């Protein structure tokens, strides 16, 4: 069993927001709070430490009260760079990542990933959802042993940027969840739709 205090959480908010017209997605208002703050507050009770990975408006993210770290790599290289930043900064044996644009992810996400990782003696546990009769991995929702830092550093030096491709080279366990909890926001219209559909 993995103790939550041995897990650091990182909220990935370092993207370009290209499909939102270039706005900083993590700072978009959702029900009175920035999206990244929703993710942070949902993740915080599930882990021992928490940080945010962001590349713009660092002061706004710092006002959320947790450490904020930009990518070490330039030019917004994607969520894998945020995961790398988390692995570089974490002081615990495990790191879990969540994106800033999925405010309703499961409140038992980390405990279920941790249980599966321990049971399978895996290095990475990744969430997945049932969609159209198939199990689809959600690669940015993953629990990783921080000892994989060197592996990820080498992988990114090759120019590859896909989380799933890197993870596939390690002992990986996939953990199924209900798809509804993983509805994410890529456009301002989708953000409005998510707000309109709230209970």
From Swiss-Prot:
Q: Indicate the principal place this protein occupies in or around the cell.
A: cytoplasm
Cofactors required: Mg(2+)
Example GO biological process: bis(molybdopterin guanine dinucleotide)molybdenum biosynthetic process
Recorded GO MF terms: GTP binding; metal ion binding; molybdenum cofactor guanylyltransferase activity
Q: Which domain of life is it from?
A: Bacteria
- Per its UniProt record, what InterPro entries does this chain match? MobA-like_NTP_Trfase (IPR025877), Molybde_CF_guanTrfase (IPR013482), Nucleotide-diphossugar_trans (IPR029044)
Q: Give, as one word, the top-level EC class.
A: transferase
Residue positions annotated to bind Mg(2+) are 101
| Record-listed E.C. numbers | 2.7.7.77
Transferase as a keyword of this entry, yes or no, is yes
Q: Which reaction does it catalyse?
A: Mo-molybdopterin + GTP + H(+) = Mo-molybdopterin guanine dinucleotide + diphosphate
Q: Which Pfam families match?
A: NTP_transf_3 (PF12804)
Q: Provide the residue positions that the database annotates as binding GTP.
A: 12-14, 25, 53, 71, 101
Q: Which UniProt keywords apply?
A: Cytoplasm, GTP-binding, Magnesium, Metal-binding, Molybdenum cofactor biosynthesis, Nucleotide-binding, Transferase
Compartment(s) where it occurs, according to its Swiss-Prot or TrEMBL record? Cytoplasm
**CDD domains for this protein:** MobA
GO CC, sorted alphabetically, is:
cytoplasm
UniProt comment concerning the protein's domains = The N-terminal domain determines nucleotide recognition and specific binding, while the C-terminal domain determines the specific binding to the target protein.
Q: Give the protein's biological function.
A: Transfers a GMP moiety from GTP to Mo-molybdopterin (Mo-MPT) cofactor (Moco or molybdenum cofactor) to form Mo-molybdopterin guanine dinucleotide (Mo-MGD) cofactor.
Quaternary structure (record): Monomer.
The protein's matches in NCBIfam families, at most eight in alphabetical order, are given as: molyb_mobA (TIGR02665)
**Protein family (similarity comment):** Belongs to the MobA family.
**Protein name in the entry:** Molybdenum cofactor guanylyltransferase
Organism name: Leptothrix cholodnii (strain ATCC 51168 / LMG 8142 / SP-6) (Leptothrix discophora (strain SP-6))
């Amino acid at each position: 069993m993995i103790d939550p205090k041995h897990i650091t959480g990182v909220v990935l908010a370092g993207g370009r927001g290209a499909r939102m017209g270039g706005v900083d997605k993590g700072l978009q208002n959702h029900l009175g709070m920035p999206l990244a703050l929703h993710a942070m507050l949902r993740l915080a009770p599930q882990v021992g430490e928490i940080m945010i990975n962001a590349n713009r408006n660092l002061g706004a993210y710092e006002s959320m009260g947790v450490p904020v770290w930009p990518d070490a790599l330039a030019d917004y290289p994607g969520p894998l760079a945020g995961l790398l930043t988390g692995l570089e900064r974490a002081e615990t044996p495990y790191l879990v990542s969540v994106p800033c644009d999925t405010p309703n992810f499961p409140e038992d996400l980390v405990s279920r990933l941790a249980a599966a990782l321990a049971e399978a003696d895996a290095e990475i546990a990744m969430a997945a959802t049932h969609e159209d009769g198939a199990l689809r991995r959600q690669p940015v929702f993953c629990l990783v042993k921080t000892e994989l830092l060197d592996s990820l550093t080498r992988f990114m030096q090759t120019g590859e940027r896909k989380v799933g491709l890197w993870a596939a080279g390690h002992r990986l366990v996939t953990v199924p969840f209900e798809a509804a909890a993983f509805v994410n926001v890529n456009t301002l219209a989708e953000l409005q739709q998510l707000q309109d559909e709230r209970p």
